[in-house]
Amino acid sequence: MPGNFIEGVKTLIVRELSDVIGSWRHAKGDGWESRRIVLADDQMGCSLHDTLVKEGAELHLEYKDHLESNYCIEGEGEVVNVATGEVWPIRPGVMCALNKHDRQMLRALKGDPGLICAFTPALSGNETHDADGGY
């Protein structure tokens, strides 16, 4: 369900996760999948993703053009600042905001961590990670 319209103006965006799974908004990579619920064409100023990371995955990431906030809803892991070696545990109820474009490593330690992620500026939906782990 893409949203409600009045004379061509979007008045409310309603989207179910089940509509995103398996669609062009569902991106997958080695050890992760991102169900991209809100994207740039929704004109909300950020994108909103329901992301799953497979237990045992170690993702090397660096978003040079985006800021990211992550809220953990299931599983456990940790985020490592590659430059400083600082480590922060991630578990349900913990938010981690990557506000300096830092190189990071995300490790999925227990279960498949589920994260609600917001990116600004918003992603268009067709991005894939480059060699540096960014978009």
Protein language model regions, located:
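Short beta-strand His + acidic residue motifs that chelate non-heme Fe in jelly-roll/DSBH
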Residues: 59-61, 79-80, 98, 103-110
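A short hydrophobic beta-strand segment most commonly corresponding to one strand
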Residues: 69, 97, 111-127
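Short, conserved beta-strand element in jelly-roll/cupin
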Residues: 50-53, 64-79
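Short acidic-glycine-tyrosine-enriched beta hairpin
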Residues: 84-100
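Residue-level recognition of conserved beta-strand positions in structured domain cores
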Residues: 50, 63, 81-83, 108, ...
